[in-house]
């Protein structure tokens, strides 16, 4: 493959995002809806998905996956709300949210890496358990519809574009540095691309799997916090689809699900926003259920054509 062709292929996800944004703005304007309101919705949803997906890159690079990330985000946000309502301590709320995200991911990694339980089994089980616990807490404390919440003034000063973009940029910059400029990142790609050769070279898969899941857990914690910044309440449906959406977003961003050397951090951000924009376009044109199904079909086509 020539250098120019590689550059063109690498640029496709960015071009697709620009085209999708243009189409989205055109559809919203043609229907007479408020463009600023819809842009805000896309922006906030895209920020959360991109942050969680960026951490998840460290899992997918190994050729593994975790579909419980959405449930973990819900669980972390739920514990954060409970913590603040009990203590009125903002800093403690953030610490609890981050720790909850990290612990949830580490449990998955330990079960999969140390006890050799298939990743699919562990993540599906964790998704069910975390969703059930969070739903029970939410319905008990506030009801399934109303949910539980913190006072809006607690996070109101953070609910602005500058803060959200700043958090995303800092998190992505940290992940890019770790992924592309440290021995850990290079070895992760090696393990994902050729696990047998990596093992023969003395690289322990379990070590990198645990560290990868840990970083994904940090992303879950940050994503849960940003969810509360956007809407300081949690319901049983909060972050419900994030786990599956991450897989679609990564493909949209130009990264193969199989991981390895072709893994890219930017795929999470570009793909995350592309997925959110496409999903909102389809919601505007057809019913949401069909729209979600179409996004899955498109992602499959992109993956198989990789």
Kindly give the residue locations of the regions a language model identified.
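Conserved small/polar residues in nucleotide/adenosyl-binding loops
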Residues: 303-306
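Transmembrane alpha-helical segments in multi-pass inner-membrane proteins
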Residues: 220, 234-297
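Single transmembrane alpha-helix segments in multi-pass membrane proteins
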Residues: 19-27, 36-86, 111-116, 250-262
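Transmembrane helix-bundle core of multi-pass membrane transporters
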Residues: 115, 119-181, 210-211, 231-236, ...
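Inter-helical junctions in multi-pass inner-membrane proteins, predominant
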Residues: 30-41, 179, 217-250, 262
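Helix-loop-helix "hairpin" substructures at the membrane interface of multi-pass membrane proteins
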Residues: 89, 93, 103-104, 108, ...
């Amino acid at each position: 493959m020539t250098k120019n062709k590689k550059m063109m292929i690498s640029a496709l996800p960015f071009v697709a995002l620009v085209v999708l944004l243009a189409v989205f703005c055109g559809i919203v304007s043609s229907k007479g809806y408020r463009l600023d309101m819809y842009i805000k919705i896309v922006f906030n949803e895209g920020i959360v998905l991109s942050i969680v997906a960026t951490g998840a890159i460290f899992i997918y690079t190994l050729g593994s996956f975790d579909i419980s990330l959405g449930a973990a985000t819900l669980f972390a946000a739920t514990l954060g709300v409970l913590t603040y309502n009990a203590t009125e301590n903002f800093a403690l709320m953030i610490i609890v949210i981050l720790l909850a995200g990290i612990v949830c991911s580490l449990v998955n990694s330990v079960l999969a890496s140390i006890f050799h339980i298939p990743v699919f089994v562990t993540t599906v089980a964790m998704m069910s358990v975390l969703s059930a616990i969070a739903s029970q807490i939410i319905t008990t404390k506030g009801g399934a519809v109303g949910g539980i919440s913190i006072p809006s003034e607690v996070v109101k000063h953070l609910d602005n574009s500058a803060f959200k973009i700043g958090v995303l940029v800092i998190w992505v910059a940290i992940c890019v540095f770790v992924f592309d400029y440290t021995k850990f990142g290079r070895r992760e790609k090696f393990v994902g691309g050729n696990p047998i050769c990596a093992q023969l070279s003395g690289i322990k898969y379990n070590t990198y799997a645990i560290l990868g899941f840990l970083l994904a857990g940090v992303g879950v914690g940050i994503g849960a916090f940003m969810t509360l910044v956007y809407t300081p309440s949690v319901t049983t449906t909060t972050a419900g689809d994030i786990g599956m959406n991450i897989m679609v977003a990564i493909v949209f961003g130009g990264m193969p699900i199989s991981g390895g050397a072709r893994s890219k951090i930017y795929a999470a951000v570009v793909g995350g926003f592309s997925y959110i924009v496409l999903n909102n376009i389809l919601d505007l044109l057809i019913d949401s259920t069909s729209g979600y199904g179409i996004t899955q079909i498109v992602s499959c086509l992109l993956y198989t054509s990789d």
